Amino acid sequence: MATISSTLLLNSSRSALPLRFPKFSGFSSSSPFARSYRFGRRNLEPLSNGMLSSGSRADGATAAAASMEGVMTEAMKLIQSASPTWKSAVANNLLIFVLGSPLLVTGLSASGIAAAFLLGTLTWRAYGSAGFLLVAAYFVIGTAATKVKMTQKEAQGVAEKRKGRRGPRSVIGSSAAGCVCAFLSIYQVGGAAFSQLFRLGFVSSFCTKVSDTVSSEIGKAYGKTTYLATTFKIVPRGTEGAMSLEGTLAGLLASFFLASVGCFLGQITPPEAAVCVLASQIANLGESIIGASFQDKEGFKWLNNDVVNVINISLGSIVAILMQQFILQNWVK
């Protein structure tokens, strides 16, 4: 494993004050954290040259240097933590959110980012960097699909509000089932026997949601003919409970891709990835039927998109867990 070290020289008229960044061993120089560290170092060093022009500034810089060194040491220790803790989860999440803020603001409102930060912290605490990367992949895919043909969607009145920037209710509605699985994993409910089931439910919930988002957004952008899930009657794009061939295929591919990411990251096995894809399609069909049958109907005004999202991803998680227990487990044996 590589060692990361650097020396930052703060020059003044009185003296040159060396600030030595701590040596961090135990993680690869090619890791995202190492690259981020080097990026920050390269940008700090030029700014430091000539920064100090008086003795008083030099004295202040000495204290600041010592403080910065302590903060950096503690932060990198948390990042390298083998077993995720709440402290390491917050530190890692904060670092990634700062570096990824240009992307985050394109897909989330300010309050949505706050909700996503809580989700990211919980995910890292439960499943470490692998779980976090899975959720990040979901966010990138979903945001990209939402932006497809945005002008056309807005003209037709079927685009997401705020140029597709999701708020806190959308974030919570899209991650509720995953959060439940994460909490159950953190506190080891049911012991080791249930640990992988909760992990499977977590992955399946996001496979379900990414499939739902992509199928909806691509269907609104490219769907040639849109059918109501309950009657197969042709309806306008954007109708609740409507489906299109183009959107359905895109959603299936998105679910397959995210399940493959989960498999690659070691969160699930290949057979479990197949379960996630199948469960996501079953859940999305169920959501379409619910939307077509009840949403926007008299007596069901409470059944808005956020509530339907919770039902959808919960179905995806539950179906995947049941399939694992009653079908896949027996088939593997």
Swiss-Prot record:
Pfam families assigned: DUF92
Membrane topology (UniProt): Multi-pass membrane protein
The organelle targeting sequence, given as a residue range: 1-65
Reaction catalyzed: phytyl phosphate + a ribonucleoside 5'-triphosphate = phytyl diphosphate + a ribonucleoside 5'-diphosphate; phytyl phosphate + CTP = phytyl diphosphate + CDP
UniProt GO molecular function: phytol kinase activity; phytyl-P kinase activity
Keywords, ordered alphabetically: Chloroplast, Membrane, Plastid, Transferase, Transit peptide, Transmembrane, Transmembrane helix
Localization, UniProt: Plastid, Chloroplast membrane
Membrane-spanning ranges: 94-114, 126-146, 171-191, 248-268, 274-294, 307-327
EC number from the UniProt entry: 2.7.4.-
Biochemical pathway: Cofactor biosynthesis; tocopherol biosynthesis
Gene deletion effect: Lethal when homozygous. Tocopherol-deficient plants are unable to grow photoautotrophically and infertile. Vte5 and vte6 double mutants can grow photoautotrophically and display a stay-green phenotype with strongly delayed senescence and an extended lifetime.
GO biological process terms on file: phytol metabolic process; vitamin E biosynthetic process; vitamin K biosynthetic process
Gene Ontology cellular component annotations, sorted alphabetically: chloroplast membrane
Function, in words: Phytyl-phosphate kinase catalyzing the conversion of phytyl-monophosphate to phytyl-diphosphate. Involved in the activation and reutilization of phytol from chlorophyll degradation in plant metabolism, including tocopherol (vitamin E) biosynthesis. Involved in the biosynthesis of phylloquinone (vitamin K), which is required for the photosystem I (PSI) complex stability.
Family according to the record: Belongs to the TMEM19 family.
Extra information: Overexpression of VTE6 results in increased phytyl-PP and tocopherol levels in seeds.
Name of the molecule in the record: Protein VTE6, chloroplastic
Protein's organism: Arabidopsis thaliana (Mouse-ear cress)
Taxonomic lineage from the root: Eukaryota, Viridiplantae, Streptophyta, Embryophyta, Tracheophyta
